[in-house]
Amino acid sequence: MLDPNILRNELGAVAEKLARRGYTLDVDTLRKQEERRKVLQVETETLQAERNSRSKAIGAAKARGEDIDPLRQEVNQLGEKLDTAKAELEKLQAEIRDLALSIPNIPDDSVPVGKDENDNLEVSRWGEPGKYDFEIQDHVSLGELTNGLDFAAAVKLTGSRFVVMKGQIARLHRALAQFMLNLHTEQHGYLETYVPYLVNHETLYGTGQLPKFGEDLFHTKPLEEEAESHYALIPTAEVPITNLVRGDILDENELPLKMTAHTPCFRSEAGSYGRDTRGLIRMHQFDKVELVQIVHPDESMDALEALTGHAEKVLQLLNLPYRKVLLCTGDMGFSACKTYDLEVWLPAQNTYREISSCSNMWDFQARRMQARFRGKEDKKTQLLHTLNGSGLAVGRTLVAVMENYQQADGRIEIPEVLRPYMGGLEYIG
């Protein structure tokens, strides 16, 4: 959520910056709402002052033995007018808030201007794609050869975009998640957390999934139904972890907070019909190890570089070729002000595919959550800055390992760093 003060005082500049990401800010509506809000605010305060004055006059008149009925009638009339003005002001403020909640974050000035993924900027590459003297197979075929991936069984149980993993492939999937968690907690200083997989609406508003992206979620009840027990499955552990500081005021010396969690993630993929229908790339349910940092505003851009480096380290230790991409304004997520994507090399597709997205949200989520800290010198409260990234998507990492480590006979070599998690096993198949 953007700062209401800049929406009031710098509306033109905000509209120009949001236009870089392809968002058209409804300037006329915002201006009209703000003008009407000011009028109603003054009217409400004036009526309140008049009613208070008349109420005091009743006491004085009563002490003098005067007839107070006319004053009482006047106070009652002022009260009715005040109630009407307050109700209109509250309704307008709710409309202003609803509109504000639908406005995306302002891109950082360092973000390249562009329309879509074709305008993203490649920052660096690590590792060289392997050369194979045999016909490359994709992870689906390799999963069939090793009897480790069963999509037909998942269709029977649930439907498309699900999978049943078996045997050593299931074990490899588990090993990847354990390896990632150990790396981030033991070497990168993150606190491991276990969080609910169901969250309430307030939590989803806090990180920006609601109100705009409700159709991307799996809900326990129809979204239109208002209910206290209305939950949604988490689309990412970013949602519950970041909301751990919702409504809190931290001490500055508690910062930064660095947390990680391994969870399943659930997404409806509402806008992805026909895309990546084969294999594990785009699933309704997938596992991810999430990285979240809650930091001082002065540190957030440095924290983004560090967090992205933590995700990169996973790929480097697995010896998987990848590239780092700075997303353009038109390809960034709703809540982000700057995002790096890490894209891993998939031999069967002969291209790089996203395996991690690391973002600085600035104070956008913190304002929605009212998450603040108290300065150690001036004791004033400020909004925190929040960051998150995949460290990594476990299913896509499994795909990358299977395809990059495949052998001519269909076996899959286990990366050295994963062998301790696999009982010393060197090959699958």
From Swiss-Prot:
HAMAP family: Ser_tRNA_synth_type1. SUPFAM superfamilies: Class II aaRS and biotin synthetases, tRNA-binding arm. GO terms for molecular function: ATP binding; serine-tRNA ligase activity. GO terms for cellular component: cytoplasm. Keywords: Aminoacyl-tRNA synthetase, ATP-binding, Cytoplasm, Ligase, Nucleotide-binding, Protein biosynthesis. It catalyses: tRNA(Ser) + L-serine + ATP = L-seryl-tRNA(Ser) + AMP + diphosphate + H(+); tRNA(Sec) + L-serine + ATP = L-seryl-tRNA(Sec) + AMP + diphosphate + H(+). It is an enzyme of class 6 (ligase). Consists of two distinct domains, a catalytic core and a N-terminal extension that is involved in tRNA binding. This is Serine--tRNA ligase.
